[in-house]
Amino acid sequence: MASILPLDTLNTSRECALKLLEEASEACEALKKHDKLNKLGTYQDALMELADVEQCVCNCLQVMGTNSGDWEDAVAEVRKRNIERGRHEVASRRTFMVEWRLYDHE
């Protein structure tokens, strides 16, 4: 499983929020370009931008001091709200998992 560790360059919630917006905008543009051209290069660009967004999410969770229980509660609440809004998960073998845990990395 691929793992992303927080970066040491963003230290405030504001910095993380701005970087998240920047990367999300770049991901949006890359996805639109891939949707239009549907080429290997545009696919790879979109994938890289999505990974950048996930890096930013990781950084934000770190800066906020989020613990694993709070993260899991937030994800469960989002799932509940999606169901209430008529948005249902697609039965698939593919699952995007974000495990927010404290590990000792040496």
Go through the PLM ranges and name each one.
Residues 1-106:
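Flexible "arm" and connector segments at domain edges
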